[in-house]
Amino acid sequence: MLNWQMAERESTEHLISKVVNSVVFFEEFVFAKNKFKSAPGMELELADAVVALDDVLLVMQIKERSDRSANTPEIEQKWFQRKVVGVATRQIRDTLRYLVEHNEIKLANEYGRIFDLAAGRYSEIIRFVLYQASDNLPESCRLKKFHRSAEGGFIHILDVEDYLKIAQLLRDPEDSIRYFRYRELMLSKLESECAS
């Protein structure tokens, strides 16, 4: 069982990419070291966390509010739009592009074993942006459950607290995959009612 008090002291990125994903998805499937060589002397960076499960790849970008002091709701909304909806979804799109453009993307899992993560090996890529904001984040931002773009497709947007609850409940990797498939299906069907 994860010690949540200890986990709260960790950075969100470390907590998600190493602790929770290793517990939920097993360390052999988690790739938290995300830099790879694309050409001699050139290094590129994938999203913050990548989880490879058979022919499904989970790609996660994590945004944490560095200044969690009592900012105004307006400042928090600007942070959310700029960092979560803007920068994080762009980083997901960049990762998707790297996965397609490169024939080989060799990364070590948490055990140090090298895997090739190029996109041709996966029938499905599930995309997430996880965020941790201050308490002053407006409800309108919290209601944004996904982002859709021509290049990135459907990208789940979740508060880190929600992700942690899901991770606690869905201990089996296949259950997590099914949950996020269903979440995408339902949010797509109800798009006009969701904060999209």
Regions found by a protein language model. Name each.
Residues 1-196:
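Intrinsically disordered, low-complexity Ser/Thr/Pro/Gly-rich regulatory segments
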